[in-house]
């Protein structure tokens, strides 16, 4: 089986590339994203809309309520291995995402040395100003109701009604920033979806900056795998981390 690995920081266009490859090959895409395993935060976690998938198949490693917490990296890695084994009849599989902890689990596991062929594509952070422009556009889209999916702020307002979800939301990019913004401006969380345009723009910029901080962390902590445009065997677990 050929495993096509696409990884990189948030807002780098990984999902779009994965969808394009899936359209050309017909292969499924497995999301290497622990937060996207919670459908209740589909918007804030960056799950693509059904229309954006363009009839391609996207597989999540779990589907759980937020009250159960975010799946841990080791659990996600076990599910990933099961999914790859389940898809063994496929000619290829696309692995796409940016979970640092999950990718590092892969880098340490001997499973990925067991005869797969690899095509590795890493997307880079690049220029900070260009990143912030992309991130602002992404957050602006998250603040809109699209295809009947609630906005990020509506997801937050709804889930804030359940005390068990609050510490989890405070640990997720985007939601954490919105919660701090509400406290700073003496707003109730359920008021956030109705803030005026000026405050909304301030919050969009704040979340974009938080995404940049997260992207810098990802760039620092990702495993370093060679990128190869040919169908060459590549064993990620055999590679040394570049400091």
UniProtKB/Swiss-Prot annotation:
Gene3D superfamilies reported for this sequence: Crystal structure of tRNA isopentenylpyrophosphate transferase (bh2366) domain (1.10.287.890), P-loop containing nucleotide triphosphate hydrolases (3.40.50.300)
This enzyme's EC code(s): 2.5.1.27
InterPro entries: P-loop_NTPase, Tzs
Superkingdom field: Bacteria
GO molecular function terms attached to this record: AMP dimethylallyltransferase activity
Transferase keyword on record: yes
GO BP terms, alphabetized: cytokinin biosynthetic process
Keywords from the named record: Cytokinin biosynthesis, Plasmid, Transferase
Catalytic activity: dimethylallyl diphosphate + AMP = N(6)-(dimethylallyl)adenosine 5'-phosphate + diphosphate
SUPFAM superfamilies per UniProt: P-loop containing nucleoside triphosphate hydrolases
UniProt similarity note: Belongs to the isopentenyl transferase family.
Role of this protein: Transfers dimethylallyl groups to AMP as part of the biosynthesis of cytokinin phytohormones.
Name of this chain's protein: Adenylate dimethylallyltransferase
Lineage: Bacteria, Pseudomonadati, Pseudomonadota, Alphaproteobacteria, Hyphomicrobiales
This protein's encoding gene: tzs
């Amino acid at each position: 089986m050929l495993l096509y690995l696409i990884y990189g920081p948030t807002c780098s266009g990984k999902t779009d590339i994965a969808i394009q490859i899936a359209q050309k090959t017909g292969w499924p895409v497995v999301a290497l994203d622990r937060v996207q395993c919670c459908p209740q935060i589909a918007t804030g976690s960056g799950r693509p809309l059904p229309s954006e998938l363009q009839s391609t198949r996207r597989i999540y490693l779990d589907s759980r309520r937020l009250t159960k917490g975010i799946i841990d990296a080791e659990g996600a890695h076990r599910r990933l291995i099961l999914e790859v084994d389940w898809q063994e009849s496929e000619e290829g599989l696309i692995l796409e995402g940016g979970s640092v902890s999950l990718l590092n689990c892969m880098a340490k596991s001997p499973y990925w040395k067991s005869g797969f062929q690899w095509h590795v594509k890493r997307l880079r952070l690049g220029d900070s100003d260009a990143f912030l422009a992309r991130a602002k556009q992404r957050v602006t889209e998250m603040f809109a109701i699209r295809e009947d999916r609630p906005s990020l702020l509506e997801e937050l307002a709804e889930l804030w009604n359940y005390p068990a979800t609050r510490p989890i939301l405070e640990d997720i990019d985007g939601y954490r920033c919105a919660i701090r913004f509400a406290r700073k401006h003496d707003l109730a969380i359920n008021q956030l979806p109705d803030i005026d345009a000026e405050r909304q723009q301030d919050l969009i910029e704040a979340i974009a900056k938080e995404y940049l901080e997260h992207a810098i962390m990802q760039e620092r902590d990702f495993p370093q795998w060679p990128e190869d445009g040919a169908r060459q065997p590549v064993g990620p677990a055999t590679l040394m981390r570049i400091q």
